[in-house]
């Protein structure tokens, strides 16, 4: 500790933010009420299915109990807890997923929820699994499965088994991860036929419980391989006889086959806990840099408490706030060395530290921007949260420099969109927005996006949004999050303005159209709120305001755990570009 490169660039960077003058009790109450609603939905989803006690009576641990024993205390960062895009009755896609440290290393962990249909594949699960492999690929960290999967839920097989991003796609992704040198480690429990079998066999290392099995098909499938096309009494009796027989024999693919004969299973354990210890053992064999190798400063907590965010981030999106106060509560010692401060004033870009590790930060500024943007008439007033020419140019430069210097990026998004109109078109905003997407796509660095409040229009994409599948490791929202292509009033006006004009000209009653407009406005509001954002996967988790820093830490430490490429500190350009602008341009 204490021996760091280029301390005059990276230590004692400018501090930002101010102490909270007065708590906003009403705002805090509103935000915490929404957080509590999310907590309750999570509780209901986790408790759905068999009771924990009933699972334990069978000699099994639940998915959450297995994760608790696998992951280091305090390191679990849940992801996609409420993800349920097709409305499964149990409120989830029957897996538990997140980032956590296993034997000192950050891993993406996915556990079959054995409380629900014995961990079956259900609608939406494949997409959630693909997001897990996306996160592992982007962060270059191991993917760990705690598998207990009974295969496809047959009565909804058309929503689970086929399709381009369907039940088989995660097996191709596991192959891709192996080819990229990203290990996939699985611990298997219980019966895993068909989709469960391929889920078992596709990882790098297979560790099994002594009662586990994995197979192309289970006993039930074997019994129905020569169907008549219908079920009659004779066939029903044959099925019943088969069940009686197989109940007394081992299902296909048990340990005596895949450990003793094929050798597919690397190790077998007699206890539930033994399998988890086996996973830890193999994770322990994997490469990892000591974080001290990449540190530029001693780890420090932010200078201000995270609880201040409940007063500083208004739930009412018509109210502005100081983004520097947010940054000050997320990064080490509330330090930020800003890139091109004053240019593109609608955006903050700069270098910050997370537990002593460098990250790039990009965030929207709120409030009025006087005499801006420059391409409009003199005396124009820009609106914070909107993107203009200078801000887009600055972000393109910043992302490109972060990519060159191999620095992960944290995006803090609260945007109403990109400026519109002929002035904006002449200022090339359409092209500059796509330029930023190009810069992000070519960066090949891990990025993490927080939708602090609003994610709107194309700005939601270009500000490091989750649409960047190859760069966005994951994204989170808050109790204040609202994601929609535009606000409801704008949508209603765009959709019904001509109808209003036409009806008024014809002397018709406008009230029916007014009612439709108000219904659309309400629908936009309802469908853009945190609950729906979580269920549809518009963000990967709704996170309490005072827990955002924990996700920033997990992302940053994971990104530096085993990076694909490195830029030596003394060869970086971004910190020097910041210094040059401050010294020779700004003055």
Curated annotation (Swiss-Prot):
Reactions listed under catalytic activity: (2E)-glutaconyl-CoA + Na(+)(in) + H(+) = (2E)-butenoyl-CoA + Na(+)(out) + CO2
Residue ranges of the region described as Carboxyltransferase: 31-558
Superkingdom: Bacteria
EC number(s) given by UniProt: 7.2.4.5
Biological processes annotated in GO: glutamate catabolic process via 2-hydroxyglutarate; L-leucine catabolic process; sodium ion transport
Alphabetized GO MF terms: glutaconyl-CoA decarboxylase activity; methylcrotonoyl-CoA carboxylase activity
One Gene Ontology cellular component: methylcrotonoyl-CoA carboxylase complex
Domain CoA carboxyltransferase C-terminal stretches: 295-558
InterPro entries recorded: AcCoA_carboxyl_beta, ClpP/crotonase-like_dom_sf, COA_CT_C, COA_CT_N, MCCB/AccD1-like
Keyword list, A-Z: Biotin, Decarboxylase, Ion transport, Lyase, Sodium, Sodium transport, Translocase, Transport
Pathway the protein acts in: Amino-acid degradation; L-glutamate degradation via hydroxyglutarate pathway; crotonoyl-CoA from L-glutamate: step 5/5
UniProt keyword annotation of Metal-binding present: no
Domain CoA carboxyltransferase N-terminal positions: 31-298
Described function: Decarboxylase subunit of the primary sodium pump glutaconyl-CoA decarboxylase (GCD).
Record's subunit section: Heterooctamer consisting of two alpha, two beta, two gamma and two delta subunits.
Annotated protein name in UniProt: Glutaconyl-CoA decarboxylase subunit alpha
Organism: Acidaminococcus fermentans (strain ATCC 25085 / DSM 20731 / CCUG 9996 / CIP 106432 / VR4)
């Amino acid at each position: 500790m204490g021996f760091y490169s280029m301390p005059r660039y990276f230590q004692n960077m400018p501090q930002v933010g101010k102490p909270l003058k007065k708590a906003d009790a009403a705002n805090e109450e509103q935000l915490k009420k929404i957080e509590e609603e999310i907590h309750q939905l999570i509780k209901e989803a986790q408790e759905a299915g068999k009771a924990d006690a009933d699972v334990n009576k069978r000699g099994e641990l639940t998915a959450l109990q297995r994760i608790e024993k696998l992951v280091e205390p305090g390191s679990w960062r849940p992801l996609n807890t409420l993800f349920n895009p097709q409305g499964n009755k149990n409120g989830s896609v029957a897996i538990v997923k997140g980032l956590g440290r296993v034997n000192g290393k950050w891993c993406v962990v996915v556990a079959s929820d054995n409380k629900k249909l014995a961990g079956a594949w259900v609608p939406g699960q494949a997409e959630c699994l693909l997001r897990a492999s996306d996160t592992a690929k982007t962060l270059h960290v191991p993917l760990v499965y705690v598998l207990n999967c009974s295969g496809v839920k047959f009565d909804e097989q058309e929503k689970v088994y086929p399709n381009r991003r369907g039940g088989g796609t995660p097996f191709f992704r596991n192959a891709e991860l192996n080819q990229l040198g990203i290990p996939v480690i699985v611990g298997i429990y219980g019966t895993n036929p068909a989709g469960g079998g391929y889920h078992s066999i596709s990882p790098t290392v297979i560790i099994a419980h002594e009662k586990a099995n994995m197979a192309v098909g289970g006993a039930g499938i074997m019994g129905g391989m020569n169907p008549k096309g219908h079920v009659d009494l004779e066939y029903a009796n044959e099925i019943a006889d088969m069940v009686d027989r197989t109940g007394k024999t081992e299902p296909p693919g048990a340990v005596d086959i895949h450990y003793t004969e094929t050798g597919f299973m690397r190790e077998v354990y007699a206890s539930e806990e033994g399998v988890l210890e086996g996973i830890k053992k193999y994770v322990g064999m994997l490469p990892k840099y000591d974080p001290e190798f990449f540190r530029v400063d001693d780890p420090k907590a932010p200078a201000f408490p995270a609880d201040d965010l409940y007063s500083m981030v208004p739930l009412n999106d018509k109210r502005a706030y100081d983004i520097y106060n947010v940054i000050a509560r997320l990064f080490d010692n509330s330090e930020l060395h800003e890139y091109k401060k004053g240019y593109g004033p609608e955006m903050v870009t700069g270098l910050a530290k997370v537990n002593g590790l460098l990250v790039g930060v990009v965030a929207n500024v709120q409030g009025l921007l006087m005499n801006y943007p420059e391409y409009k008439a003199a005396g124009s007033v820009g609106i914070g949260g909107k993107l203009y020419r200078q801000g887009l140019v600055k972000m393109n430069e910043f992302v490109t420099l972060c990519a060159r210097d191999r620095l992960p990026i944290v995006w803090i998004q609260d945007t109403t969109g990109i400026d519109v109109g002929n002035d904006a078109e002449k200022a090339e905003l359409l092209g500059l927005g796509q330029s930023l997407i190009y810069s992000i796509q070519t960066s090949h660095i891990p990025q993490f996006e927080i939708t602090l409040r609003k994610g709107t229009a194309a700005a939601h994409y270009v500000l490091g949004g989750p649409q960047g599948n190859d760069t966005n490791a994951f994204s989170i929202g808050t109790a204040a999050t609202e994601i929609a292509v535009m606000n409801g009033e704008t949508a209603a006006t765009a959709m019904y303005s001509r109808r209003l004009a036409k009806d008024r000209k014809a002397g018709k009653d406008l009230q029916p159209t007014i009612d439709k407009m108000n219904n659309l406005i309400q629908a936009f509001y309802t469908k853009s709120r945190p609950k729906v954002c979580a269920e549809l996967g518009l963000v990967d988790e709704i996170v309490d305001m005072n827990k955002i820093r924990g996700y920033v830490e997990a992302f940053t430490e994971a990104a530096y755990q085993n990076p694909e490429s490195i830029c030596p500190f003394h060869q970086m350009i971004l910190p020097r570009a910041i210094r040059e602008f401050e010294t020779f341009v700004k003055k």
